[in-house]
Swiss-Prot record:
<keyword id="KW-0808">Transferase</keyword>
<dbReference type="Pfam" id="PF13469">
    <property type="entry name" value="Sulfotransfer_3"/>
</dbReference>
<feature type="region of interest" description="Hydrophobic">
    <location>
        <begin position="1"/>
        <end position="16"/>
    </location>
</feature>
<dbReference type="InterPro" id="IPR052796">
    <property type="entry name" value="Nod_factor_sulfotransferase"/>
</dbReference>
<comment type="function">
    <text>Required for the formation of sulfated nod factor. Proposed to transfer activated sulfate (PAPS) to a N-acetylglucosamine of the nod factor.</text>
</comment>
<dbReference type="InterPro" id="IPR027417">
    <property type="entry name" value="P-loop_NTPase"/>
</dbReference>
<keyword id="KW-0614">Plasmid</keyword>
<dbReference type="GO" id="GO:0016740">
    <property type="term" value="F:transferase activity"/>
</dbReference>
<protein>
    <recommendedName>
        <fullName>Nodulation protein H</fullName>
        <ecNumber>2.8.2.-</ecNumber>
    </recommendedName>
</protein>
<keyword id="KW-0536">Nodulation</keyword>
Amino acid sequence: MTHSTLPPRPFAILAMRRTGTHYLEELVNEHPNVLSNGELLNTYDTNWPDKERLLLSDRELLERACWRYPPHSDKKVTHVGCKINEPQFQERPSFFAELTAWPGLKVILVIRRNTLESLRSFVQARQTRQWLQFKSDSSAPPPPVMLPFATCEAYFKAADDFHARVVNAFDSSRIRLIEYERLLRDPVPCVATVLDFLGAPALQLADRGILRRQETRPLDQTVRNFHELRVHFANGPYARFFELAND
């Protein structure tokens, strides 16, 4: 990897789990000057061969991410980043403050409009132990799942709280919101928006990604107790998550 004279500009992709951050990272990394290095706080992320890094202080860990990141290619890196999801901040609560204080760091907050889809996807992936789906994989879709009322409510609240926390912690010039649904529908212009926000040179990406969406069926076919949940959350702040296209 070739380093430019100036240190790369740092960024972080923040999100709840199962919001398309792997896909976004795959597309962003098509740019010859941008490198996103996976989940910094994930012990098992293969982008980071040294698990001992998690023993570092918060500041040392961010220095590792921004200045001493692992080489992946011969890219001339001008923008370097990583991903962090909401549960990882729970496991390392002091890290959020260090992130907000890091000079020049920009944040891409990825939001899935329907948080129930995010939870359903997480439970499916956990049960099947299949966290990614490749375009070459023709396996059957994952089985439907049961979602307890309390689990849904806690997850919905956690998502609302996390999104508000991130938005309130960063100046508007340092944060950009990306919707999962738009990323799937229009990946090329969506990534162009991200690159422009980071200040990376414009580039027409080819969307040669190898990942694909694991589940495309509607919620009433993938959540066994969907209708019971719909009744339970009717007329409340989360009723919108249970709307179907044919309603």
